Amino acid sequence: MKLRGLVVLILAAAVFSAPALAAPKRADPIKMFDTDNDGTLDLAEVKKAASALFAKLDRDHDGTLDAQELRGRLSAKELAAADPDHDGTLTLDEYLAVVEQRFNAANPDKDGTLDAKELQSPAGRALLQLLR
């Protein structure tokens, strides 16, 4: 009877730990985007990453991103606020303006760089949504 209980316990542990083990880890954003290797991200590095993602997301190559291309990176309300001409799309400049706003929100010490701790904050995670 004890052996059966042990087997059940081991199987339960395996079942419940499998999803955690199978879940892919996200790459370290500092390592991904820190082109000068100083251990932080500055606005230029963030904008470079955002520009690259913009080009990748712009599947129809019209120079804008609509809600479908943004794939949930911005809520409808955020998209409307970031869209000064109210055409339902963001140009690269409009997208980078949102990126800069989120960068500034994630940089409470105003030192011009984001470290790992700042990127883990809610504002930092919101910024990372626009880079990945």
Language model segments and positions:
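Bacterial N-terminal signal peptides that target proteins for export
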Residues: 1-8
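Bacterial N-terminal signal peptides
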Residues: 8-17
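EF-hand Ca2+-binding helix-loop-helix modules
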Residues: 21-56, 67-81, 92, 96-102, ...
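Acidic carboxylate motifs that coordinate Ca2+ or other divalent cations, activating on Asp/Glu
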Residues: 34-38, 58-62, 85-87, 107-111, ...
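A mid-sequence interfacial segment
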Residues: 110-127
